[in-house]
Amino acid sequence: MKIYFAGSIRAGRDDATIYETMITWLRSYGEVLTEHVGNPLLSAAGDGHLKVACGPDNRYIHDRDMAWLTACDLVIAEVTTPSLGVGYELGWATVLEKPVLCLYRIIAGRPLSAMIGGSPGIQAAEYSSMDEAKRIMEEFIKKTAEGII
C-alpha cells in the first residue's frame, strides 16, 4: 500500500515529532511516499536535503508531490497546524478520488476548517493521544483495503 502523509512544513514545524511518530507507525502498513514530512531536521524552509544545498525549487516540489499523490492508495493528513500546502494536497486528493483521513487535535482558537470538516470526500477525526490516532488510522486503512471507503 502506498500512503501519502501530509503535514505542515512551511506553515510551521511544531508538530514534526507527531508526524514522525505517525509515519514510523504507518510504515508497517506500506510505503510512506512522503516520509520526509516527519523528519525533525526538516525546517519550515522545506526539504533542503534533496537536489541542491538550498533545496529543490517550488516547481520541483509541486511536481514531485503531485506525482506521489497520484500514485498513492490513500492520504492521511495531520491538520492541527493549518497549512495552505496541505489544503491544496487535500483538495487534489478529493479530485483524484483518493480515500482521505484528516486527524486533528483540539486547540483553543484553532478550529478545524469547515472545508475539511464539511467535505464529503474527507473523513475527519479528532484525537487526543497517539494511541487514539493509531487506532483511527488502523481502522481507516483496514476499511480502505477492504474497499469500504
State what each model feature region is.
Residues 1-149:
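Conserved catalytic or regulatory cores that recognize and/or transform ribose-phosphate-containing ligands
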